[in-house]
């Protein structure tokens, strides 16, 4: 199955699907830059961000989309993948926005892109895992605003004192 490089959600925020090794490397470098996230990356996150963007090239069910700023630098990224059980539940593998580009609606538009992608892939829902750290409060609010429900909490998942929160949104099916 061949997928377009952009979807309607992607076009709205000028997001492009990673389609080349060079784009995958730029996305990896962006995700691995110090201070991008509110908390330190775990060793597993570092490994995933180093390898997963390139591994999704040519995959129908997994992908990364990125936005460039006016200077051409990557300023926002979202990664989406089918869950390992392959049951139609997708996961956000990464969502990151450069500090200077935050509070402009990019996160909302990228999550809308993810929801469009999942619906277009006949997925049943989208799972989002995020930190309980207070620096992630704007993300928690955005997820709630977009209809995600907090469905779980795992204490000390990332590091002692930093829990993981799971948010989920089912994909609505409309009869044709």
Name what the model sees in each region.
Residues 1-22, 169-176:
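Conserved N-terminal entry element of GNAT/NAT acetyltransferase domains
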Residues 18-93, 98, 111-113, 117, ...:
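Acetyl-CoA-dependent GNAT
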Residues 86-88, 136, 158-163:
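Short acidic/glycine-enriched loop/turn segments that link adjacent beta-strands
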Residues 93, 98, 102, 131-133:
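Residue-level recognition of the GNAT/N-acetyltransferase active site
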Residues 97, 103-116, 141, 145:
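Conserved acetyl-CoA-binding loop-helix of GNAT-fold acetyltransferases
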Residues 118-131:
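Conserved GNAT acetyl-CoA-binding A-motif
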Residues 129-131, 144-165:
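Conserved catalytic-core motifs of GNAT/GCN5-like acyltransferases
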Residues 130-140:
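Short, flexible, glycine-rich and Lys/Arg-enriched loop motifs at helix boundaries
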């Amino acid at each position: 199955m061949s997928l377009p490089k952009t979807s309607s959600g992607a076009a709205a925020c000028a997001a492009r699907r990673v389609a080349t090794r060079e784009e995958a490397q730029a996305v990896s470098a962006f995700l691995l830059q110090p201070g991008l996230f509110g908390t330190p990356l775990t060793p597993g996150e570092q490994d995933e961000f180093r390898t997963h963007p390139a591994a999704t090239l040519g995959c129908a069910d997994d992908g990364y989309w990125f936005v460039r700023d006016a200077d051409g630098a990557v300023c926002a990224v979202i990664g989406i993948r089918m869950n390992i059980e392959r049951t139609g539940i997708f996961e956000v593998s990464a969502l990151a926005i450069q500090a200077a580009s935050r509070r402009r609606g990019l996160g909302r538009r990228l999550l809308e892109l993810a929801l469009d992608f999942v619906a277009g892939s006949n997925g049943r829902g989208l799972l989002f895992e995020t930190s309980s750290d207070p620096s992630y409060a704007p993300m928690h609010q955005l997820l709630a605003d977009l209809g995600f429900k907090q469905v779980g909490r795992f204490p000390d998942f990332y590091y002692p004192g930093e829990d993981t929160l799971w948010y989920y949104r089912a994909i609505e099916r409309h009869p044709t």
